[in-house]
UniProtKB/Swiss-Prot annotation:
Gene3D superfamilies: 3.30.70.240, Ribosome maturation protein SBDS, N-terminal domain, SBDS protein C-terminal domain, subdomain 1. Keywords: Acetylation, Cytoplasm, Cytoskeleton, Nucleus, Phosphoprotein, Ribosome biogenesis. One of its GO terms (molecular function) is microtubule binding. This is Ribosome maturation protein SBDS. GO terms for cellular component: cytoplasm; cytosol; nucleolus; nucleoplasm; nucleus; spindle pole. PANTHER family: RIBOSOME MATURATION PROTEIN SBDS.
Length: 250
């Protein structure tokens, strides 16, 4: 599709229009096809790679640019880049049924890939294949949400799959190096956040190697920094504690 915009004499091609209604008026932005989903999923972070122009339109196909007073009334600002971000994040993508179906299929696969990459069977510590995660998602009738990032949806899928199968996020392996004086007291605070303590060594420092749920990493990191006043250290030994091989389920 080629759109001619007489206001600035730019011919926009390969256009995906994202629309938002605000304050009783319609606002549109012109994006590159296949880039909107990437922005919303967090894969694409460069706004210039997504937007064909930083202008806000009332009608992209006719090249009608929104009036400054209408932007201020609807969005509280006339900063078109910021308004473009709002529309890009929350607006409705104008695509054909075929394009929408293709996008949703791709997001479905992306979500399954994230889940397969981050999770294991807790009994065998082995990962599931992407194909089997896709099958499980279909079994629970998971419906992709086009306006939500694939990472957020992957977390939702994991929660729902836990009710139907043996699955959990793979543990991270960490090493703590803590001053001996603060270490013993800090260890008690860290205990509830550690899944498995693999080794402890008391010498000049307290060294602990353990497995944790990835969701606890930030809390542990902040706790160590706060309690040791920067004297302690935290090292990630492995992001995923898994066994080799693929776990299959029917």
């Amino acid at each position: 599709m080629s759109i001619f915009t007489p206001t600035n004499q730019i011919r926009l091609t390969n256009v995906a229009v994202v629309r938002m209604k605000r304050g009783g008026k319609r606002f549109e932005i012109a994006c590159y096809k296949n880039k909107v989903v990437g922005w919303r999923s967090g894969v694409e972070k460069d706004l210039d790679e997504v937007l064909q122009t930083h202008s806000v339109f009332v009608n992209v196909s006719k090249g009608q640019v929104a009036k400054k007073e209408d932007l201020i009334s609807a969005f509280g600002t006339d900063d078109q880049t910021e308004i473009c971000k709002q529309i890009l994040t929350k607006g409705e993508v104008q695509v054909s049924d075929k394009e929408r179906h293709t996008q949703l299929e791709q997001m479905f696969r992306d979500i399954a890939t994230i889940v397969a990459d981050k999770c294991v069977n807790p009994e065998t510590k082995r990962p599931y294949t992407v194909i089997l995660i896709e099958r499980a998602m279909k079994d629970i009738h998971y419906s992709v949400k086009p306006n939500k990032s694939t990472k957020q949806q992957a977390l939702e899928v994991i929660k729902q799959l836990k009710e139907k199968m043996k699955i959990e996020r793979a543990h991270m392996r960490l090493r703590f190096l803590l001053p001996v004086n603060e270490g013993k007291k800090l260890k008690e605070k860290l205990k509830p956040l550690m899944k498995v303590v693999e080794s402890e060594d008391y010498s000049q420092q307290l060294e602990i190697v353990c497995l944790i749920d990835p969701g606890c990493f930030r809390e542990i990191d902040e706790l160590i920094k706060k309690e040791t006043k920067g004297k302690g250290s935290l090292e990630v030994l492995s992001l995923k504690d898994v066994e080799e091989g693929d776990e299959k389920f029917e």
